[in-house]
Amino acid sequence: MAHKKGVGSSRNGRDSFSKRLGVKLFGGQIAKPGSIIIRQRGTKHHPKKNVYMGKDHTIHSLIYGKILFKKTNKKKSFISVIPI
């Protein structure tokens, strides 16, 4: 057994940078084609009309219009863009 504690035992002190996930444009706001509406991990929000999902589950607008959020279940929410 050691009589003195080993110095330099800092196992903590590292952290990852935040991924900046979440809603970028809210309901009622205007979206341009290609603009990011939601950045997410997995499919918490699902695309509906005039919206497409990227390979990292980011939801983008296809057209110029107003954003509409709609919930069907307690967990599922759908995003669509209504043309103006």
From Swiss-Prot:
GO terms of biological process kind: translation
The organism's place on the tree of life at top rank: Bacteria
GO CC terms: ribonucleoprotein complex; ribosome
MF terms (GO), sorted A to Z: structural constituent of ribosome
Family matches, as InterPro entries: Ribosomal_bL27
Coiled-coil residue spans: none
Keyword Metal-binding carried by entry: no
Disulfides per UniProt: none
Keywords: Ribonucleoprotein, Ribosomal protein
Protein family: Belongs to the bacterial ribosomal protein bL27 family.
PANTHER family per the UniProt record, alphabetical: LARGE RIBOSOMAL SUBUNIT PROTEIN BL27M, RIBOSOMAL PROTEIN L27
Protein's name according to its UniProt entry: Large ribosomal subunit protein bL27
Protein encoded by which gene: rpmA
